[in-house]
Amino acid sequence: MARITVEDCLNQIPNRFKLTLAATYRARELAQGHAPRLDSKDKPTVTALREIASGLTGLEMLRKVPT
């Protein structure tokens, strides 16, 4: 199993606070039943981080949040 690191995710989203928010929102979507964008048998949080590190998910997660 490959390990995911925060540094891999920070290459995609340089601001660690925005990274945390994007990962949280995506993990919540996955936990509610949305389909993952990559094959993963990990928990929603790890899957969200893997998606961010691979560039499949990014700051668009922050634009989807209602204000």
From Swiss-Prot:
Keywords: DNA-directed RNA polymerase, Nucleotidyltransferase, Transcription, Transferase. Its EC number is 2.7.7.6. It holds the Pfam family RNA_pol_Rpb6. The keyword Transferase applies. GO terms for biological process: DNA-templated transcription. InterPro entries: DNA-dir_RNA_pol_omega, Pol_omega/Rpo6/RPB6, RPB6/omega-like_sf. GO terms for cellular component: DNA-directed RNA polymerase complex. It catalyses: RNA(n) + a ribonucleoside 5'-triphosphate = RNA(n+1) + diphosphate. The keyword Transferase applies. SUPFAM superfamilies: RPB6/omega subunit-like. One of its GO terms (molecular function) is DNA binding. Belongs to the RNA polymerase subunit omega family. The RNAP catalytic core consists of 2 alpha, 1 beta, 1 beta' and 1 omega subunit. When a sigma factor is associated with the core the holoenzyme is formed, which can initiate transcription. Promotes RNA polymerase assembly. Latches the N- and C-terminal regions of the beta' subunit thereby facilitating its interaction with the beta and alpha subunits. HAMAP family: RNApol_bact_RpoZ. This is DNA-directed RNA polymerase subunit omega.
